[in-house]
């Protein structure tokens, strides 16, 4: 793809995690005047973002939207169908879907011939590893600066995330950014929060046939799969984390609805790519999905107890129901 072939865009819609932030920053390096909106998968799929997406919008690290002009992603369940791709491209859209370790990596490879991305070179391997389950147990336990930094990123703090993007676009390295007082303060807070959260995970997790079920709903806490699987150790092959609020709303970043996240235990040998956990995420929620090793969904009617019982039953029969073909 030459610079002439890179689609024109004036807006970037990206996921609100480290991968999405880096993807957005890389794209903004190419088009500095583009504005950025951080979102999440459910908002794309339920139509909440429709008014912000048009042919001048590039979407990165989020589900496909037929009204955008350029689509970049790497999630298994987000890959457009052949029919969607044909219709989209006939209308002038460009699809870049590749099974890269991160969506930011895909953006990086597309943009690097045409923009100076030198300050991303040292950052990209970590973003790839974090998003693809490539963090080692030692790296996780050590909880280095980048691990902490990744947890400071949230849709609840869009101004902070945009500040980070603008510094990356201006050429700052991630090491320089992490020394800034407003970032260093957040890093220290995340270190303390993780100690508290690990105890909360211990107190609220049970194991059913090597599936860790962590109940964080209505607590105000959330966790990624790394913390739960590291805490439970080699006694689990995967985890299911319930989070959000019983009265939550998709468009309220501070009080999201009840949801479930599923993660393979990437810390054990052959822990990934054994079971397709996205089949759990899409069992009830047509808008659920992600990767086979890391995915999520919203709790659907008739409710959590019913959904969880079915997921446990599917897990009990995982060697036939979930086993990767």
What do these predicted regions represent?
Residues 138-196:
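Accessory alpha-helical/coil subdomains and C-terminal extensions
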């Amino acid at each position: 793809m030459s610079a002439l072939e890179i689609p024109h865009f004036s807006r970037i819609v990206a996921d609100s995690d480290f991968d999405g932030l880096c993807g957005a920053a890389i794209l903004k390096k190419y088009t500095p005047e583009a504005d950025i909106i951080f979102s999440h998968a459910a908002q794309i799929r339920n139509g909440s973002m429709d008014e912000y997406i048009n042919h001048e919008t590039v979407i990165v690290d989020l589900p496909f939207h037929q009204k955008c002009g350029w689509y970049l992603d790497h999630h298994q369940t987000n890959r457009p169908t052949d029919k969607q791709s044909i219709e989209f491209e006939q209308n002038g859209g460009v699809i870049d879907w590749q099974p890269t370790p991160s969506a930011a990596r895909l953006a990086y490879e597309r943009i690097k011939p045409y923009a100076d991305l030198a300050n991303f070179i040292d950052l990209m391997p970590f973003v790839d590893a974090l998003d693809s389950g490539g963090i080692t147990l030692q790296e996780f336990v050590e909880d280095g600066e980048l691990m902490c930094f990744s947890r400071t990123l949230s849709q609840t703090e869009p101004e902070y995330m945009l500040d980070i993007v603008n510094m990356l676009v201006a050429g700052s390295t991630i090491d320089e950014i992490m020394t800034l007082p407003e970032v260093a303060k957040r890093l220290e807070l995340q270190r303390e929060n993780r100690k508290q959260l690990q105890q909360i995970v211990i107190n609220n997790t049970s194991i059913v046939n090597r599936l860790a079920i962590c109940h964080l709903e209505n607590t105000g806490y959330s966790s990624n799969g790394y913390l739960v699987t590291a805490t439970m150790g080699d006694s689990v092959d995967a985890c299911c984390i319930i989070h959000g609020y019983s009265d939550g709303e998709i468009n309220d970043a501070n009080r999201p609805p009840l949801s479930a996240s599923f993660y393979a235990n990437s810390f054990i040998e052959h822990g990934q790519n054994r079971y397709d956990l996205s089949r759990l995420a899409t069992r009830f929620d047509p808008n659920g999905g992600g990767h086979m090793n890391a995915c999520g969904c919203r709790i659907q009617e008739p409710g959590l107890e019913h959904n969880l019982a079915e997921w446990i039953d599917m897990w009990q029969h995982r060697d036939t129901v979930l086993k990767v073909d």
